[in-house]
Amino acid sequence: IITDHHTCKDRITTAAAAILNPKRPDCDYPFDALAGVGVAFKLILALAIKNGLKTTDVFNQYVDIATLGTIADVVPLLGENRVIVDKGLKILHNPKRIGIRAIMEVAGVLDKPLNASTIAFSIAPRLNAAGRLGSAATAVELLLTNDESRARELALLLDTENKERQQTERQIFDEALELIAKDPNFEKKKVIVLAQENWHQGVIGIVASRLCDMYYKPCILISHTNGVGKGSGRSIKGFNLFDALTHCEKQLIDFGGHAVAAGLNVNMSDIDSFIKEINKYADEVLTEQDMIPTVDIDCPLSERSVTLENAKLLSKLEPFGMNNEKPVFALAHAQVMNIAPVGADNKHLRLRIVKNNQTINCIGFGMGEFAEFIHQGDTVNIAFQMDINHYQGNETVQLILKDIKRK
């Protein structure tokens, strides 16, 4: 039995007894956005029904694992996915699995407020690190073990592998930027396609995502060995990557994925024609307006509404995630009190603003470069999400910056 959740081609040929995939053209299941783990979870529940087991007990036994996978797979947090994550987070607040407790402790989030974002940025990368750099066996053993000391050992190993993954990611990212700098036609291309020998397969997708965000262009990174390249791509709103690869299938060995993320195999002898064809397709599909990143603001907010009480009320709408994002607000005509880059490589931004004698603290992840052109005393408009900062037992309202515009 094969379980999958990737977009299928029209014809599926296999010797399998069954293929469970809500995206099959002949599947009429009403919710087709399940993560891979969600499809496997549904199979487990079906087997429970078949064998006369109490489905509530089986659901509660595995929903924590299904939650981790659903968040890590970055699928739309709607419908059944949202139900799975909502139920799973309640269990993960006090995890019963020894391995999950161990990885949460190593990540520094055990016994702290937990939401989908915590899983996405603190837990999922560590669990994924083993599979990205080699074998996923370490993560599997962690989730299965009943030995506390072994769980601690495995969690520390995954934490180390995650740091190695981050180092490899930085190296590939820097090499990708060098390739971009050497391309005289880069600005004319709507799709970034970069190829390098022996880039790490498990990391190129993350780097493609970073470049996609940085340049706001679809991006495909390809690692090649012995004349064959394996690629991973990420896309922007308005450009269906699976459709684009379908259009270019004559240049590819094979491919698969979704609208926003996909993988491919290509003979390097065909790479130039592939780059030409996918950019030709992008020229037909994407307008200049599509290439301009936007921040969708749900509503303007006055400084009087930026309170801890309102931040707590918003948190009751959790879980938030893809296609069900936390509301984005706008605050106009605030004055900058302090601004500074913070974190490793000054990658992030710490900002303090004031309006009508109310001081507000903000953090901008990946926005460190804003400190170069926004200064103390400037008047700014900001787009933000309201959050709660937990520090030494105290709670304060904190704004997560999405954009800043100087007046």
How would you label these PLM feature ranges?
Residues 49-270, 290, 294, 300-301, ...:
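Hydrophobic helix-and-loop "lid/oligomerization" segment in the mid-to-C-terminal part
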Residues 13-52, 59-71:
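Short alpha-helices
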Residues 11-15, 31-33, 76-83, 204-206, ...:
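Short acidic, glycine/serine/threonine-rich loops at helix termini
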Residues 1-13, 19-22, 171, 175-178, ...:
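N-terminal small/polar loop signature for handling phosphorylated ligands or for N-terminal nucleophile
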Residues 150-154, 160-194, 247-407:
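Mid-to-C-terminal polyanion-binding domains and interfaces
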